[in-house]
């Protein structure tokens, strides 16, 4: 089965000025598309040819895994953002964040510290553990919670291509602006 680039849940310029249209043109239109294209070139005639994206991520390794996981990770990232995002979580998710970190601000500080310290290229995730508690997890390269017992709630892409056009090498500045775009509704649905 051929995989396709999922549509963005908003217009290319909808996250500006925090994430520019130019960044999305490259990040979504080039990087994300390339992972889809590479995956489609790698799977014909293999055991992965007719599997869903999630099944491929869970069962593959090497180039197939890297491209499939990056398709999944990026799609999750786009949904973790919203032009109407920001603010604070509510309900059960807010309660779980406060139970773990004491406050939403303390959580954001811990997340930013983790993401800023995520060496090289990767992802920083808010995850729900098997016991129902929350945690912040860094993954490198294409690694994803999808291959673990953790349930991803939201993610921040800390590959340089996610922020270099807008913030150059200032990852902490990108992280500061990330919170104004966070889609807490998406995170809450994943938590439920």
Curated annotation (Swiss-Prot):
Entry note: cofactor: Binds 1 Fe cation per subunit.
Required cofactor(s): Fe cation
UniProt record similarity statement: Belongs to the iron/manganese superoxide dismutase family.
Residues that bind Fe cation: 27, 74, 157, 161
Coiled coil regions, renumbered to chain: none
Function: Destroys superoxide anion radicals which are normally produced within the cells and which are toxic to biological systems.
E.C. number(s) listed in UniProt: 1.15.1.1
Subunit field text: Homodimer.
GO terms for MF: metal ion binding; superoxide dismutase activity
InterPro entries according to UniProt: Mn/Fe_SOD, Mn/Fe_SOD_BS, Mn/Fe_SOD_C, Mn/Fe_SOD_N, Mn/Fe_SOD_N_sf, SOD_C_sf
Reaction(s) this enzyme catalyzes, per UniProt: 2 superoxide + 2 H(+) = H2O2 + O2
Species name: Bordetella pertussis (strain Tohama I / ATCC BAA-589 / NCTC 13251)
Key words of the record: Iron, Metal-binding, Oxidoreductase
Name of the protein this chain belongs to: Superoxide dismutase [Fe]
């Amino acid at each position: 089965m051929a995989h396709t680039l999922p549509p963005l849940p908003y217009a290319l310029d909808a996250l500006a000025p925090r994430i520019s249209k130019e960044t999305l043109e490259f990040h979504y239109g080039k990087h994300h598309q390339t992972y889809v294209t590479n995956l489609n070139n790698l799977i014909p005639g293999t055991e992965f040819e007719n599997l869903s994206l999630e099944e491929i991520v869970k069962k593959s390794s090497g180039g197939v895994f890297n491209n499939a996981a990056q398709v999944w990770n990026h799609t999750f990232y786009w949904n973790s953002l919203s032009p109407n995002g920001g603010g604070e979580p509510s309900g059960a998710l807010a309660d779980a964040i406060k139970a773990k970190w004491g406050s939403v601000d303390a959580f954001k500080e811990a997340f930013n510290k983790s993401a800023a310290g995520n060496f090289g290229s990767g992802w920083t995730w808010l995850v729900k553990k098997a016991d129902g508690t929350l945690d912040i997890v860094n993954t490198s390269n294409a690694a994803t919670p999808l291959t673990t017992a953790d349930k991803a709630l939201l993610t921040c892409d800390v590959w340089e291509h996610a922020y270099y056009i807008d913030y150059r090498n200032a990852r902490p500045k990108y992280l500061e602006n990330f919170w104004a775009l966070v889609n807490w509704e998406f995170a809450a649905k994943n938590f439920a």
